[in-house]
Curated annotation (Swiss-Prot):
It is a multi-pass membrane protein. Glycans are attached at N72, N99, N114, N199, N317. It catalyses: (R)-noradrenaline(out) = (R)-noradrenaline(in); (R)-adrenaline(out) = (R)-adrenaline(in); serotonin(out) = serotonin(in); dopamine(out) = dopamine(in). The lineage of its organism: Eukaryota, Metazoa, Chordata, Craniata, Vertebrata. This is Solute carrier family 22 member 3. CDD domains: MFS_SLC22A1_2_3. It is found in: Cell membrane; Apical cell membrane; Basolateral cell membrane; Mitochondrion membrane. InterPro entries: MFS_dom, MFS_sugar_transport-like, MFS_trans_sf, Orgcat_transp/SVOP, Sugar_transporter_CS. A motif (Proline-rich sequence) lies at residues 284-288. Belongs to the major facilitator (TC 2.A.1) superfamily. Organic cation transporter (TC 2.A.1.19) family. It comes from Mus musculus. Mediates the uptake of clinically used drugs including neurotoxin 1-methyl-4-phenylpyridinium (MPP(+)) and platinum-based drug oxaliplatin. Plays a role in the anticancer activity of oxaliplatin and may contribute to antitumor specificity.
Length: 551
């Protein structure tokens, strides 16, 4: 009885049918990138902000002040670099403290000795000068409420984490396609609610839910793509779909620049997900998943459809396909750590996901601290990631998965450590080394997706990838706090932490089995055999080397 991989080779491993499905699902990567980094523009700091008191409000109306005049006459001088974004005041002049009973002049400080009015902390009635409206001005996320802006990104990553557990499990139990479609619908609905949220609480709740569904759509589409093509094509589709994520990062600044409000940006992020519901008629359920669920006839129907579109034909020899699993069981967390090889892979992959998220997001946010044009800087940061994908495509088939995976982490780690100790007087060298670190961690982030999906058996693949990548979401939750809290102690301290994490990760991933050119494992036993067979081969090579040297 033929296996699924044999039937897929007969139907075409990457023919016209797979290319069409692949291209359509890759678009999910663009919209997920919008969601993943959209807070940079949704929560962009206003150019200036300050607060009004009762007398300042009356004076502004009577004297017809411009925003700049009100800023200069009612708030204390702010000594910060002119190029720094988000200049603002958390205090105002207490104009009500003057003893005069007459109306203040349009230069209210003349009523105070030495033009020195007392200061008081702001408590509301904020004013903003900004090119585009943002959630900062919408919900007054400044001064004592500034931490709430960090919460908006943390809650999104928490949603990603919840989606990894819940929808990853659901996709393995109920099917890839149905969970993908539900997730896309959820991203659209919750995104619209976020755009028109009447208050911050509603905004946060539905942003969390959008994170849940966003993660479900992204991870499920990635698994569908890797399961519908042959083993030789998995490296290409696994990396190219990451390039579409980078494409989303490159496109987003243009959308944000030409969209005058944060609500418009939020709708641009969310509404395209409704279009993915049309995939119900063109994207099939994963036939590999159907076989593991004892639905071989449905899988054969899809394979015949694939073969017809690819100009192939499945003979009567393929009327049945082998179901590898004697017993089909629902996935469990314990399955990921029950056996030695699965346990080792799971723990290393979790650490790799965590490291990739912390270092990647940390380096991205650190670039934002240097000021400059937000839109251009963000666009350039996206372009830096493209060579990483090309380097992966050139190396992983020649060198395997482990060596590029380890090298990219080590390059990122060493670059962070070197940058931390380079003197400020040679900015070109610091920028060059930092860019090399960004390139390295981008490659590591993209390779971990591919390796994770190749190391887990079919019955656990979606659940396993989702669970391990949950550590990526956990890293995303703590990355902003790790960066800014450590930078307050010493600006370069976060780079040292990032460097240590990435370097350690580079060593650990060398302990993973090599997956170059192998068939996707169908069962846990396949994974155990994969690890033990490679260990045995390694031992035989060492033995041969010893005997040769003795001769």
């Amino acid at each position: 009885m033929p296996t699924f991989d044999q039937a897929l080779r007969k139907a075409g491993e990457f023919g016209r049918f797979q290319r069409r499905v692949f291209l359509l699902l890759c678009l999910t990567g663009v919209t997920f990138a919008f969601l993943f980094v959209g807070v940079v523009f949704l929560g962009s700091q206003p150019d200036y902000y300050w607060c009004r008191g009762p007398r300042a409000t009356a004076l502004a109306e009577r004297c017809a002040w411009s925003p700049e005049e009100e800023w200069n006459l009612t708030t204390p001088e702010l000594h910060v670099p002119a190029e720094r974004r988000g200049q603002g005041h958390c205090h105002r002049y207490l104009l009500e403290a003057t003893n005069t009973s007459s109306e203040l002049s349009c230069d209210p400080l003349t009523a105070f000795p030495n033009r020195s009015a007392p200061l008081v902390s702001c408590s509301g009635d904020w004013r903003y000068v900004e090119t585009h409206s943002t959630i900062v001005s919408q919900f007054d996320l400044v001064c004592s409420n500034a931490w709430m802006l960090d919460l908006t990104q943390a809650i999104l990553n928490l949603g990603f984490l919840a989606g990894a557990f819940t929808l990853g499990y659901a996709a393995d139990r109920y099917g890839r396609l149905i969970i993908y479609l539900i997730s896309c619908f959820g991203v659209g609905i919750t995104g619209v609610v976020v755009a028109f949220a009447p208050n911050f609480s509603v905004f946060v709740i539905f942003r969390f839910l959008q994170g849940v569904f966003g993660k479900g759509a992204w991870m499920t589409c990635f698994v569908i793509v890797t399961e519908i093509v042959g083993s030789k094509q998995r490296r290409i589709v696994g990396i190219v779909i990451q390039m579409f994520f980078t494409l989303g990062i490159i496109i987003l600044p243009g959308i944000a620049y030409f969209t005058p409000s944060w609500q418009g940006i939020q709708l641009a992020i969310s509404l395209p997900s409704f279009l993915f519901l049309l995939y119900y008629w063109v994207v099939p359920e994963s036939p590999r998943w159907l076989i593991t669920r004892k639905q071989g006839e449905k899988a054969l129907q899809i394979l015949r459809r694939v073969a017809k579109c690819n100009g192939k034909h499945l003979s009567s020899n393929y009327s049945e396909i082998t179901v590898t699993d004697e017993e089909v069981s629902n996935p469990s967390c314990l399955d990921l750590v029950r056996t030695p090889q699965m346990r080792k892979c799971t723990l290393i992959l979790m650490f790799a996901w965590f490291t990739s998220a912390v270092v990647y997001q940390g380096l991205v946010m650190r670039l934002g601290l240097i000021g400059g044009n937000l839109y251009i800087d963000f666009f350039i940061s996206g372009l830096v990631e493209l060579p990483g994908a090309l380097l992966i495509l050139l190396t992983i088939e020649r060198l395997g998965r482990r060596l590029p995976f380890a090298a990219s982490n080590i390059v990122a780690g060493v670059s962070c450590l070197v940058t931390a100790f380079l003197p400020e007087g040679i900015p070109w060298l610091r920028t060059t080394v930092a860019t090399l670190g960004r390139l390295g961690i981008t490659m590591a982030f993209e390779i971990v997706y591919l390796v994770n999906s190749e190391l887990y058996p079919t019955t656990l693949r979606n659940f396993g990838v989702s669970l391990c990548s949950g550590l990526c979401d956990f890293g995303g939750i703590i990355a902003p706090f790790l960066l800014f809290r450590l930078a307050a102690i010493w600006l370069e301290l976060p780079l040292i932490i990032f460097g240590i994490l990435a370097s350690v990760c580079g060593g650990l991933v060398m302990l993973l089995p090599e997956t170059k050119g192998i068939a996707l494992p169908e069962t846990v036993e396949d994974v155990e055999k994969l690890g033990s067979s490679q260990l045995h081969q390694c031992g035989r090579k060492k033995k041969t080397q010893v005997s040769t040297s003795d001769v």
